[in-house]
Amino acid sequence: MNSLIATPPVPPHFYETSCRSPSYSMSSTNTSVNRKRKAEDDCPPSGDTRMSASPSGSPALHPRPLAPRHLKRPRPNVSGRPLSLPRLMETLDTDALRSVLRSLCDRHPEIASEVMHTAPRPSVSAALEVLSNYQSTLQSSFPLGGNPSSDYAYNRVRQHLTNLLEALNDFTPHFLPPNESQPSTSLSYLDGATDIIHRLPRWTTPQHNIEEYAATEAGTKNWQSTNETAGGKLQDALKRAQPEPWVDRWQTWATRATALRETSRRYANSSCRAHTVLAYRSKSGHGNSIQYQSSKPHFLFSTFNPSIHPSITALLSTPHYTVQVDGFRAIFNETITIPIC
């Protein structure tokens, strides 16, 4: 008996409406496509699929064109070059700059004249500092031990001594009238130059002291010319303002300065000691006090003992004046020279 066996019913698939993978076909049409199909190609996108997929054409995210970057590429062939003039000047010290400027002035005289007119006038402190440097070099060149006044010491320091005296002879005319119109500037320089002359070394051999004698005599001449100029200007100024009785004493300035020069010449020839007394008016109007500064006996402006020099005692009896021994340090002073042989 032919009976049909009832097949149990197949329950429907849970995702009935979901897409099923297409059956794989080996037809020639499918092989010509040669690509794997995806589920998204046949199935309508669900809500979950739409949320997980990234938007392809969002209107809020338009691609912005980037500006081209101009990169400075290193040059393949970099060659060296010398420094510019300002940078080169920054690397030079004072001595190197002085050497370069001196060589330029020697090769080009027109540059030398331009430098002379452009450079500022040297001050008294700058000139005395240069002279002090020469003197320090002289003192440091003495040999250690032994007699500092011997011929051996003289030969060791002779060149440095010559450099100091040459610098002194070059600087001094610059601060003298008529090149220097201010008497106070001239006297201030001469005061410092006199101290340098006083510190010159003294030698055992008399021939070696000729340079010191010449510098001393030149210093007295410079004091004479400067004192005459300063005295005349001061006298004219006081007569125009409020003349005083002691102004007339300035008329004897030139004579006493000449006596100082003669004394220095005798000092150089016969080893006389010259004592210079500077008299000026006391601020209180009277007084007979003595002020002095210690120095070596062989110096031109040396200290004195008034108890053994009666000629100085007579000067002390003059009222309204004070006696000072200080190597022409005061500007408004009168000079009296007392040679002691």
From Swiss-Prot:
Bias (Low complexity) ranges: 21-32
Compartments where found: Cytoplasm; Nucleus
Subunit architecture: Binds the proteasome.
A GO CC annotation given for this chain: nuclear membrane
Region listing for Disordered, in residue ranges: 1-84
Protein name: Tethering factor for nuclear proteasome STS1
General function of this protein: Involved in ubiquitin-mediated protein degradation. Regulatory factor in the ubiquitin/proteasome pathway that controls the turnover of proteasome substrates. Targets proteasomes to the nucleus and facilitates the degradation of nuclear proteins.
Biological process terms in GO annotation: nuclear protein quality control by the ubiquitin-proteasome system; proteasome localization; protein transport
Native source species: Arthroderma otae (strain ATCC MYA-4605 / CBS 113480)
Keywords: Cytoplasm, Nucleus, Protein transport, Transport
Family to which this protein belongs: Belongs to the cut8/STS1 family.
PANTHER family named among the record's database cross-references: FI02826P
A GO term, aspect molecular function: proteasome binding
